[in-house]
Every structure is written in structure tokens, then in C-alpha cells.
From Swiss-Prot:
This is Type III pantothenate kinase. Its EC number is 2.7.1.33. It is an enzyme of class 2 (transferase). It catalyses: (R)-pantothenate + ATP = (R)-4'-phosphopantothenate + ADP + H(+). K(+) binds at residue 129.
Length: 262
């Protein structure tokens, strides 16, 4: 049994794998002020509520885009699981070739998603991760990670509008029935949701063109992240929604590196 942790700016997603099967999945809020013991108590409670034995965990892997939280999480893993966690970063075997100008700049989450999608789908790829930031990544069929685009997540965009425009309210992120709306709340929802859909459509089509200009076949477009379903279904050019892509990538990377885990 292995424990995988995907640490994002807003949430920490945890998963338990028995071989290749995801048997449990949990979500905690990301808080850099929380101590190792506070995280440890939370995680132990999650194991208890799902009737899982933490002593059966034989390996742990962490991907994080929040450096300031890592001391607490690594200390928690060592104290409560008696394991040195594997951390996604330089020196880790991934099976993909990073063609970024500076490979160290590529976020761990983007690498993990690329590993999972390359392993699962085995073709040219565009990967979209709808998180605090929305990332678009292009991967050749041979596993070359070419780069991509980063933009504010849809929730960040919505919050920025609420915070900077005094008379505009915070709204629920749902798709209105029409683009032409007759009240302020629906009008904001229209602008945010349909505007974001348009952004996704254009970036995907532009990346498809650039990949095909380099000789790649028609890429498969894979989406993941909390708001993938809301945006992808309307964007029309997303082929697959895989909500567990990042967790799968962590499992795959763990298997590639398990001899290094002490």
C-alpha cells in the first residue's frame, strides 16, 4: 500500500493505492502554518474513518508546488509512518524528457500529469489542469515535454473581479443558460465561465496547430482538476476528463523510483 500526496496552492489531495488500484482519496486544505502533528492527526483520522491500517503503508510520494509546507509534511510522514517520503524533483526518474529552457522551472504537478498521461495514453498530448492556476502542457508521443501555458484559474479570476470591483458580488461558478444575461449575477457568471471556455478553446487549438507543425499526429486533449468537467464539456475540444491523473502520475513515478526509497 502506498500513500500519494498532491500538494496544491489550495488543497492537498491524498490517495491510497493497493498495487494499481486507487482505494481511497481525500482532500485537505493547504495551510503552511499547520504543524506536522496537526497534519498527522488529520491524516490518521482519515485512515481511521476509512478503516485503513497506516502501518501497512510501505511507501509515500509527494508532489508539491508549495515549498513552505514541505518541512511539516515530510516531518509528518517520518513521524507517523516511519518512512522517508519520495519527493518529486530533480534527480527523480520520470520517463519523460523535459525540453523547457530551464527544466527546474517546471512545476512538479505539471511533470506528474505529463508522466501519467504519457504512460496511460501513449500518444501526442495536450494536458489541461484546472487548479488555482490553469496549466496547459504539450507532450510529444515519444515523451518529450515541450512546455505550455499558465493562466489564472477560474476561481482566481472570479475572486479578483469581486475584490477589485466594489459593486460586483461574489458569485457561484456555474454555467448560465445564456450568454446574454439579464441580471448582474448571471452576467458575471456568463463572462467568467463562457470567457474561460473561450480561452481554453483557443489555447488548445493553437497548441494543436503548433504540435502538428512539428510533425506530431492529432494530439489527445486530457483535462484534470476540480473544474475540468464544468469547462471541458462546453469547450468541445477536450477528449478525456481524468480526475485522478495527478494521483496516477505519482503512483507511476513511485514505481519507477521505488528502489531509491529507504
Amino acid at each position: 500500500m502506498i500513500l500519494v500526496l498532491d500538494v496544491g496552492n489550495t488543497n492537498i489531495v491524498l490517495g491510497i493505492y493497493n498495487d494499481t488500484k486507487l482505494t481511497a482519496e481525500w482532500r485537505l486544505s493547504t495551510d503552511v502554518l499547520r504543524s506536522a502533528d496537526e497534519y498527522g492527526i488529520q491524516v490518521m483520522n482519515l485512515f481511521q474513518q476509512d478503516k485503513l491500517d497506516p502501518t501497512l503503508v510501505e511507501g509515500v510520494i509527494i508532489s508539491s508546488v508549495v515549498p513552505n509546507i514541505m518541512y511539516s509534511l515530510e516531518h509528518m510522514i517520518r513521524k507517523y509512518f516511519k518512512i522517508n517520503p519520495l519527493v518529486v524533483g530533480p534527480g527523480i526518474k520520470t520517463g519523460i524528457n523535459i525540453k523547457y529552457d530551464n527544466p527546474k522551472e517546471v512545476g512538479a504537478d505539471r511533470i506528474v500529469n505529463a508522466v501519467a498521461a504519457h504512460e496511460i495514453y501513449k500518444r501526442s498530448l495536450i494536458i489541461i489542469d484546472f487548479g488555482t492556476a490553469t496549466t496547459f502542457c504539450a507532450v510529444r508521443e515519444n515523451g518529450d515535454y515541450l512546455g505550455g501555458a499558465i493562466c489564472p484559474g477560474i476561481k482566481v479570476s472570479s475572486e479578483a473581479l469581486f475584490e477589485k470591483a466594489a459593486k460586483l458580488p461574489r458569485v457561484e461558478l456555474i454555467k448560465p443558460a445564456y450568454a446574454i444575461c439579464k441580471n448582474t449575477i448571471s452576467s458575471i457568471q456568463s463572462g467568467i465561465v463562457y470567457g474561460y471556455i473561450g480561452q481554453v478553446r483557443y489555447i488548445v487549438e493553437r497548441m494543436k496547430e503548433e504540435l502538428q507543425e512539428e510533425g506530431e499526429k492529432e494530439p489527445l486533449v486530457v483535462a484534470t482538476g476540480g473544474l475540468a468537467k464544468l469547462i471541458s464539456e462546453e469547450a468541445k475540444n477536450v477528449d478525456v476528463i481524468n480526475p485522478f491523473l495527478t494521483l496516477e502520475g505519482l503512483r507511476i513515478i513511485y514505481e519507477k523510483n521505488r528502489v531509491k526509497v529507504i
